[in-house]
Amino acid sequence: MSIFIGGAWPYANGSLHIGHAAALLPGDILARYYRQKGEEVLYVSGSDCNGTPISIRAKKENKSVKEIADFYHKEFKETFEKLGFTYDLYSRTDSPLHHEIVQELFLQLYEKKFLYTKKIKQLYCTFDNQFLPDRFVEGKCPNCGTHSRGDQCDNCSAILDPIDLVDKRCSICSNEPEVRETEHFYYVFSEFQNLLETYLNDAEETVRWRKNAINLTKRYLREGLPDRAVTRDLPNGIPVPIDGFRDKKIYVWFEAVAGYYTASVDWAQKLQNNITDFWNNRTKSYYVHGKDNIPFHTIIWPAILSGLEIEPLPEYIISSEYLTLENKKISTSNNWAIWLNDIIKKYDADSIRYFLTINAPEMKDANFSWREFIYSHNSELLGSYGNFINRTLKFIEKYFESEIPTKYLEGEILYNLKELYTTVGNLVESGHMKQALEEIFEYIRSANKFYDDMKPWALRESDIEKCKEVLATCVIIILNLGQMLNPFIPFSGKKIEDMFKTKLNTWNYISNLPNKLSDVSMLFDRIDLKKIDEEVLELQQTSSR
């Protein structure tokens, strides 16, 4: 089976924060899991380097768009690598290949009569002498009344036309823009209404999408799909490849989602592979993103793929709700955020991955608090998992000269461990990463109870053979837990591999024992509880500057 996984493309206009990681981490868990199962996996993403957000940042910093995009693309790649993300290709939308393929796709849709031109009213800033891209316009959302950008409301997730905003202002100069006429290409979304309704019903019946994706997509389809502009008068982006329109750019929402396909082509060309191995009706596809990206993955991208007759359509939609910070909405403009390139310097990547998974905003908003993060690390990763491994292996190292006993106990504890592979695997495949990790740590608690109940320290005096069997059983548990946790917290898994000089890279139950331990080391260090107040204070101070 081939597995395609697409992670949402962050805008290269500012650093990544913990909210980005919470939404994107399920993609890496899926990729690692399926690779361990032996499936063919293609996991792609990239930096969104076109469109308005980068232009706004460039204007503010008096830099070129390329300088801004280059800086953040490099930072993104390094940050994802430090967090253990295993993209097969992390690309960017300003690459020549992306531009070339998007223009080809645009022409294919034009030739198929899915694109047509239309004269429209668009906002123009007389002070800055330019048509305003949607994100250059701010005002009140006409649906819910909250402050919004011109392209989409963060509060109600509505896709907007900036002309409909109330109290419109140019985000560059804060002046009120005027309405002028311009001509653009439109995509015939209305022709795909019935197809998308069938597509949605199938996803709902088979429970392949999260509820927020089902409900939001239902709302859009119930309201009826309007045709939408696919070109804009933008300062940067991909030029429209048709005479008379070459000064216009292909709208970012169209070309950014096409990045999943262009990155796949790029990967295939680099490795001399066949793109159709992953773009066919037998491939299982996952799209991993935040709640605000739902319509782009459940309506826009499926409609474009259908027009191009490219398969598969997005099958699994792993759409996270929002992550708050200390019970307040993350705000990059107010610096109320924990930046990934900062937290990764101070804390173990596995600690970050663990907390953002066990506390994931899968079905409802979740909160990141420094207290919970540090207590979670100390009590679960260190206190439960790390302690079980350390006390078992230190016992073997001290009393058996690191020689691992050869005979283990068959019983309920190992039967449950074998069954756990199926339980966790099914949960991961259906996108329930939080519950999968909870199941593993529930088992870890039972493993600690097994150790305490069997009392190997007492058996060493009264029944040395039984003591060896208990320790060997615990080693089997450690090996399988290390392997099963690899998709979630891979860096600790590597430490376990090093201690046993073995590989933990399949999704099959391990029953063979290694002969000898290498140097035993702690998987995790305790975090001083004083860090809680220090981190909260730093957050408050930086956000008030």
Curated annotation (Swiss-Prot):
Any Pfam family from its record, for instance, is tRNA-synt_1g
Reactions accelerated catalytically: tRNA(Met) + L-methionine + ATP = L-methionyl-tRNA(Met) + AMP + diphosphate
EC number in record:
6.1.1.10
InterPro entries in UniProt = aa-tRNA-synth_I_CS, Anticodon_Met, Met-tRNA_ligase_1, Met-tRNA_synth, Methionyl/Leucyl_tRNA_Synth, MetRS_core, MetRS_Zn, Rossmann-like_a/b/a_fold
Q: Which GO terms describe its biological process?
A: methionyl-tRNA aminoacylation
This entry's comment on the bound cofactor is: Binds 1 zinc ion per subunit.
| GO MF, one example | methionine-tRNA ligase activity
Identify the residue span(s) of motif 'KMSKS' region.
Answer: 329-333
What does this protein do, in the record's words?
Is required not only for elongation of protein synthesis but also for the initiation of all mRNA translation through initiator tRNA(fMet) aminoacylation.
Which family would the database say this protein is a member of? Belongs to the class-I aminoacyl-tRNA synthetase family. MetG type 1 subfamily.
Q: What is this protein called?
A: Methionine--tRNA ligase
Q: Which organism is it from?
A: Streptococcus pneumoniae (strain CGSP14)
